[in-house]
Swiss-Prot record:
InterPro entries with a match to the protein in the record: Aldolase_TIM (IPR013785), TAL/FSA (IPR001585), Transaldolase_3B (IPR022999), Transaldolase_3B/F6P_aldolase (IPR004731), Transaldolase_AS (IPR018225), TSA/FSA_arc/bac (IPR033919)
Keyword Transferase attributed: yes
Protein name per UniProt: Probable transaldolase
UniProt lineage: Bacteria, Pseudomonadati, Chlorobiota, Chlorobiia, Chlorobiales
An example Gene Ontology biological process: carbohydrate metabolic process
Amino acid sequence: MKFFIDTASLDEIKAANELGVLDGVTTNPSLIAKIVKDPANFTYADFKAHIKKICDIVDGPVSAEVTTLKAEEMIAQGEELAAIHENVVIKCPLTVEGLKAIKHFSSNGIKTNATLVFSPTQALLAAKAGADFVSPFVGRLDDISTNGMELVKQIVTIYDNYGYLTEVIVASVRNPLHVVESAMVGADIATIPYSVIKQLANHPLTDKGLEKFMEDAGVMKP
């Protein structure tokens, strides 16, 4: 299973990369907005420069999302983003217009990530249009009392049934259990906030054991 980090923070990306477990990065407009210190003067050129910095840190796919709703505009914007670095993946919303853009990109060798996926039919359409990745949002489904992980299971089954090569990125991950369940149902990737990545390494019994080991190590003579 691959681990992506879901953030636009360069510091978080660097920290996660140092752990040796990072395979890629996903960003979106909301995550970009969190790291902008001067929104009034933040330009599209600044956005592209930031994506380039991320690509310089991580040797893996970096998803950058289009910020328009019409297919023609998504295509123009996506082609501009794809030119930043060979690892850039264009995130398109799973809408009718988004599908048109995904088909265009897949036909022209530009990698895509179908995002904001909340149903198996959306995921099926994404695969048929040639998306390289599909991102079901489990946490947001859980928020409305729907089983988000059940959707992931359905998508994995459908893709396996028909041999689709689209990789499933479990998104909107809220806790370590989401990661465990993603691995158990066979998802290809989980894209995880840095706070949750750190939680994956923690266990109270590990802390307790270390405390005892350090205490016992103190009796050793130099």
